């Protein structure tokens, strides 16, 4: 079976950028996939399944992130992570509402 690969680029639009809670959401979502997933900012690539690695990107509002995946579910992984980033971490907002 041939390895699939997929990639996309997204821009961080949330006011606080990629802080701990969004990094946690990304890492948890990425962990649902078998594919290897990397996120790159300014030439620095990190494992999307690692919260600490994601934090090292220091991605602020307006930062462009390249998401690359290789593996059997690469396109699904890219789609899921891009959706999370494009929708300003909707799950985070829903969690905040439920906690209040």
Task: Describe the residue ranges of each PLM region.
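Acidic-glycine-rich active-site phosphate/pyrophosphate-binding loop
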Residues: 1-3, 31-32
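N-terminal loops that bind phosphate or other acidic moieties
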Residues: 3-6, 51, 95-100
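Intrinsic-disorder/low-complexity, polar/charged segments enriched in Ser/Thr/Lys/Arg/Asp/Glu/Gln
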Residues: 3-9, 64-66
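Compact, glycine-rich, soluble single-domain proteins
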Residues: 11-61, 86
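Low-complexity, flexible helical/coil segments
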Residues: 16, 44-48, 72-79, 100
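C-terminal structural segments of small proteins and small subunits
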Residues: 64, 68-97
């Amino acid at each position: 079976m041939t390895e699939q690969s997929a990639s996309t680029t997204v821009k961080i639009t949330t006011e606080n950028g990629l802080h701990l809670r969004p990094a946690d959401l990304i890492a948890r979502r990425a962990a649902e996939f078998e594919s290897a997933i990397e996120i790159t900012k300014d030439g620095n690539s990190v494992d999307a399944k690692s919260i600490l690695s994601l934090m090292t990107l220091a991605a602020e509002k307006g930062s462009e992130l390249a998401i690359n995946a290789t593996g059997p579910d690469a396109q699904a992984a890219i789609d899921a992570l891009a959706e999370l980033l494009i929708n300003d971490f909707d799950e985070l907002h829903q969690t905040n509402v439920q906690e209040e």
